[in-house]
Amino acid sequence: MLIQDYLDICDPVLTFDRFMGEIELEKYLKNIPQHYTGRLRYDPVSMLKTVLFGFMANGYISLRELEDQCKVNLRFMYLMDHQAPSYRTFGYFVNEVLADSIEEIFQDINKKIFETEHVDLQHLYIDGSKFEANANKYSWVWKKATEKSRYRLFGKITTLFEEINEELSCTGMKLCINSEYAPEYLKEAAEQYAEVWQINEAMFVHGSGHRKTTQQRHYEKLKEYAAKLEEYVEKIKICGENRNSYSKTDHSATFMRIKTDYMGNDQLLPAYNVQVGIADEYIAVVDVNQYRSDMDCFIPLMNKFYTTYGFYPKYPVADAGYGSYNNYIFCEQHGMEKYMKFTMFKKETTDKKYHEDPFRAVNFPIGEGGIMRCPNGKSFYLQYRKNVKGNKYGRQEEVYQCEDCSGCPYAEQCKKTDKNRTVRINRELTAMHQEVIENLESIQGALLRMNRSIQAEGTFGIMKNDRWYKRIVRRGIKSVLLEVFLVSIGHNLYKYHNKQKKVAAAA
């Protein structure tokens, strides 16, 4: 009997095999190098199917588990035609063959599913979750601490240069003293110093009972400071402009605060920020970021969606972690409606006392000539405009000050200092917040918010609790992306099979 005779007609592997048979898999496998000696190669298409089915069936499957399943599991035997590649073979195939084409495979599988299921891509439910990296917990490198150490080292180098210049005053050689130094300059200075004094490192003395010469001490310090400065430069370079930390074990991982604090001390852990966009329960777009904040992940995720599907979703729905001035402007520029909550959304919509508080600047009435007045009738006048730090669209805040707060009967409720009250206002952002409230408080907005909770947060719930994928296994951003794409493909195929099974049961 054939293996398929032992399988139910609705078995996941048969659904998977029929679906994958409609996709041209050979085009992803053209870059496999040819070999002319040794044993015959395993069929690359069968290998690809086996790997993808492993992630569909298990949520996450290791290389050794793949090897074992091919020996004992009828479904994997069916896909591999009774062959059982070793875990090393699977490792080479995943890391070398699939690494460059996995995103294209994810996109093509999605397009086939979406075409079959008539998935609505105009409504995209967005959420993010921090997955702990495969890195040691106490392996942190902090960018600010490194910069402080580097500046302290600059001071030590300056002191050393002053001593050396005093020593070399009779030779005519002089080292330039600056506020900052480069490792290359210190290495060059060490070479010049060694040349002037004809230093031979083989003659250096070490240990107790030996007294180092001034030349040996200065030369060793130059070499030590150059190596230390080179180390600091490398650490800051690894962090880059957008990160404040990284792990020594996995340089791509950033230290973040994650919800699952099993250490119980509110400690930061090395992690990746995984972002997903869900459409009709399928992962339409996925991205892995090193940013701690979800706000910074929204625009890269939307651009990735556009690159894949050729348009932006009309209704991107997200929680309060995504609502920012930059993201709202991006939505306006690309024809997307504003359905992302902002930080104070819940308080604005549920706390009537806060929303209608007459002492909030946004509730101050505007009188003749556009002059803002407080509850006591005093005028507020524009003092200056201030650029908001880190805003790429040139957002400005207007700073207003009350003309006179002396003797005000509402002073205790209105202000905290003895000076005239000062308020900061961005009318454009306030108008955006009002638009978001109107959108999300409408009937359509309420339905979209409910669906986001079910679909976006539900996807991570299925991943972590039903399919037991709670932690990143690979190291390095490229390998982590490969892993997350495989998990996402497996999730979508798993969802597709379940929906097909329900349709068959209802027929």
PLM segments and residue spans:
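A Lys/Arg-rich helix-loop hairpin that forms a DNA/phosphate-binding surface
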Residues: 39, 81-82
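Anion-binding and metal-coordination hotspots
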Residues: 51, 59-72, 83-507
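Long, acidic, intrinsically disordered low-complexity segments
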Residues: 1-9
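Basic, short loop/linker segments at the boundary and entry of helix-turn-helix/winged-helix-like folds
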Residues: 9-49, 55, 427
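Secretory-pathway/luminal and periplasmic proteins that interact with or process carbohydrate-rich
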Residues: 75-81
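A general alpha-helix detector
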Residues: 2, 46-52, 89
